A protein has these predicted regions:
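Absolute protein N-terminus
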Residues: 1-2, 93
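Enriched for short, Lys/Arg-rich terminal
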Residues: 65-69, 73-93
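Basic, Lys/Arg-enriched alpha-helical interface segments
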Residues: 2-60
Length: 93
């Protein structure tokens, strides 16, 4: 399966990385590297991740990583990563 990063995810991740890098650019780079590596594991068994608490669709799942929730959609041949949430009621807050 191919992983597609939607603009909503990329923008939110970049914003969070900017915030982390204020304190430590090295930690920001490590956070990004570790997160991308975890996301790359999704295609091996995407349904092992919990059903999203933000959506009622069985194909939308949540990957919890260091207090953040990465929301992704499982399609036939792709995984669409579109949400990056921390302490929000909705992934679009």
């Amino acid at each position: 399966m191919k992983i597609i990063f939607k603009d909503t995810f990329v923008i939110r991740l970049a914003s969070q990385l900017d915030y982390i890098s204020i304190d430590s650019p090295k930690r920001a780079r490590k956070f990004k590297s570790d997160l991308i590596n975890r996301i790359k594991e999704i295609p091996t068994n995407p349904f092992r991740y919990r059903k999203s608490i933000y959506f009622s669709d069985e194909n939308i799942r949540d990957l919890v990583f260091k207090g953040y929730t990465i929301v992704f959609r499982i399609n036939d041949n792709t995984i669409e990563v579109f949400g990056f949430v921390k302490f929000q009621n909705k992934p679009t807050d």
